[in-house]
């Protein structure tokens, strides 16, 4: 039995999946979690619903720990983005461009790995309450000001969250190989051993499953980036078809949120969890 976190659904529940081949690559098999992609999760940062992953720091959201960089391309994109930030965009620009910089050495999976520097308890790119430019990720806010997708300026792990992509080569019975890409929810377990210790995490909280659109639509740019345009178009068509038929394994957090939002016949809201 999985550990229960107050206000969140359990980690283990039924999910529906679909597998299809990349229209542009017959050796690329994509497995997509329809339960997650058809959920109504949405980012609730900056609202009372966001409690933060670290107790006592709700204004950090999920930015308390800094972001590990995935590769050289990830760092190059971040470096280019930093060059576009001004003092009006980034509260700690003087610190980030100072002697200690905006990156620091750490370890990931037992190997050396750069991550964004923590400053005053959170990622150095996180603008805090009271900053004239507003709270939140300086990179994200700058992208919106420029009219570009945030994924073009933020580290990979930041713009992909809470989409989890994993890949592995698998050998079929005839000894041929295909690359299998799995697209699913980045839940607490995605954070590793420390995931269970997070003060709060949004994907399991019904209060974050109040989006106007399902995840496959609200995260269309991100999914297109990780899968490619044609593969995403195929996935989106399948999601729309599945939604029309009725999903069997609805995400439990979405189900609770919808139940709360549906009045009973006498106009009284149903009880929560």
Predicted regions and their residues:
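Short loop/turn segments that flank or connect secondary-structure elements
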Residues: 1-273
């Amino acid at each position: 039995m999985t550990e229960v976190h107050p206000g969140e659904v359990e980690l283990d529940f039924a999910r529906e999946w679909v597998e299809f081949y990349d229209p542009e690559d017959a050796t690329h098999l994509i497995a997509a979690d329809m339960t997650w992609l058809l959920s109504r999760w949405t980012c609730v940062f900056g609202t009372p619903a966001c409690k933060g992953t670290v107790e006592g720091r709700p204004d950090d959201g999920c930015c308390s720990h800094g972001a590990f960089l995935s590769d050289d391309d990830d760092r190059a994109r971040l470096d280019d983005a930093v060059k576009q930030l001004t003092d009006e965009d980034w509260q700690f620009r003087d610190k980030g461009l100072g002697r200690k910089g905006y990156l620091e050495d750490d370890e990931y999976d037992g190997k050396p790995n750069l991550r964004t520097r923590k400053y005053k308890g959170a990622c150095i790119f996180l603008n805090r309450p009271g900053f004239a430019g507003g709270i939140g990720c300086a990179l994200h806010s700058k992208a919106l000001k420029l009219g570009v997708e945030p994924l073009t300026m933020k580290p990979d792990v930041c713009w992909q969250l809470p989409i989890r992509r994993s890949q592995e080569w698998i050998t079929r019975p005839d000894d041929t190989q295909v690359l299998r890409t799995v697209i699913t929810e980045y839940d607490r377990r995605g954070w590793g051993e420390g995931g269970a210790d997070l003060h709060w995490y949004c994907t399991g909280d019904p209060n974050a499953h109040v989006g106007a659109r399902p995840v496959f639509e609200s995260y269309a740019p991100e999914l297109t980036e990780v899968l490619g345009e044609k593969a995403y178009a195929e996935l989106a068509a399948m999601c729309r078809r599945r939604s029309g038929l009725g999903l069997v394994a609805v995400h439990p957090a979405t189900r609770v949120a919808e139940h709360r939002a549906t009045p009973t016949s006498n106009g009284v809201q149903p009880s929560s969890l």
